[in-house]
A protein has these predicted regions:
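C-terminal functional extensions of proteins
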Residues: 211, 215-216, 224-267
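A C-terminal functional module that forms or caps the active site or interfaces directly
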Residues: 183, 189-200, 206-207
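Glycine-rich, highly charged phosphate/nucleotide-binding loops
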Residues: 51-67, 163-171
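Short, acidic/small-residue loops that bind anionic groups at enzyme active sites
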Residues: 90-111, 198-217
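N-terminal glycine-rich anion-binding loop in soluble enzyme alpha/beta folds
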Residues: 1-56, 122-159, 249, 255-261
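Active-site rim beta-loop-alpha module in soluble metabolic enzymes
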Residues: 134-187, 194
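Conserved beta-alpha
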Residues: 100, 104-138
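Periplasmic-binding protein-like
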Residues: 8, 70-80, 180-189
Length: 267
């Protein structure tokens, strides 16, 4: 029997933009019984740089995944290294919910003693510190290096590879040679288009978080495992309708804003 995995994309976007995210499925070999379905959220923060952004992201992703089991999905992967919405979805769902951030950092320690995170933007450092703190893994992270390029969360690196990838290679080599990293972690699923070249250019493993999360979900499903209800207790009085109405209102508020420019506002 086929297993359906819902990939929640953390920004509203067009079908053309969504295709950039779907390319991640070509970077991993999954069992033929695994079907991936990509679904953008209806509303999201402009960027992921503040606690307000994190809260809005959690709510948007919660809304997108609340009915996943009813809709026939067997697992969820959240397409952001921030792991936004993962904990809250686990509290309301029985099916596995996988975040690429935690999966990436934990896998890095199976491949080496220490890892570094290479990312686009210093403004994202808070996301990594949050997860590293939750995992008590700061001592295992050799460094976090940024190339200081404002990310494009919808078009990703498309058309910009020749300018951006060399910067990522340079930053990664500094992580290895100066900081002592044994493994390089890509700081965002939006960087997946750079993975192949980075792996060819570097002497250590480079983890592509999105595809890794898909493979992890497949493995968890094959073992009939899911998250612990002791860690993620269900709400005593669920209020899903409040969440749906909040996001419905938020989506109306964002409706007339051009998707291609939404991240550039207020930066």
């Amino acid at each position: 029997m086929n297993k359906k995995i819902l990939i929640i994309v953390p920004f509203p976007m067009t079908e053309s933009q969504l295709s950039n995210r779907k390319e991640q499925s070509q970077k991993v070999t999954l069992n033929k019984s695994i079907d991936l379905h990509y679904q953008p959220v209806k509303a999201a923060p402009r960027t992921y740089v503040s606690q307000e952004d994190y809260l809005i992201a959690d709510i948007g992703i919660l809304e997108a995944g609340l009915n996943a089991k009813i809709q026939g999905y067997d697992a969820i992967c959240v397409d952001t290294v921030s792991d936004s919405g993962v904990a809250v979805l686990r509290s309301v769902l029985e099916i596995p919910v996988i975040g690429p951030g935690r999966v990436m950092f934990l896998t890095a320690l199976m491949l080496g003693e220490k890892f570094s995170i290479v990312t686009m933007w210093k403004e994202w450092f808070g996301l990594y510190h949050k997860t590293l703190t939750e995992l008590n893994m700061h001592e295992k992270c050799s460094s976090i290096r940024s190339i200081d390029v404002i990310p494009d969360n919808r078009e990703l690196l498309k058309g910009k590879e020749s300018n951006i990838v060399p910067l990522l290679v340079e930053a990664s080599k500094k992580c290895i040679e100066k900081d002592g990293a044994d493994v390089i972690c890509l700081g965002s699923t939006t960087m997946h288009q750079a993975h192949e070249i980075l792996q060819k250019e570097l002497s250590v493993p480079v983890i592509n978080p999105g595809p890794l999360s898909y493979k992890t979900a497949e493995t968890i499903l094959s073992l009939n495992l899911s998250h612990s209800r002791k860690t993620y207790p269900k709400p005593k009085i669920p209020n899903h309708q409040m969440v749906f109405k909040m996001i419905e209102a938020a989506a109306i508020n964002e409706k007339d804003k051009p998707l291609e420019k939404i991240e550039k506002d207020n930066i």
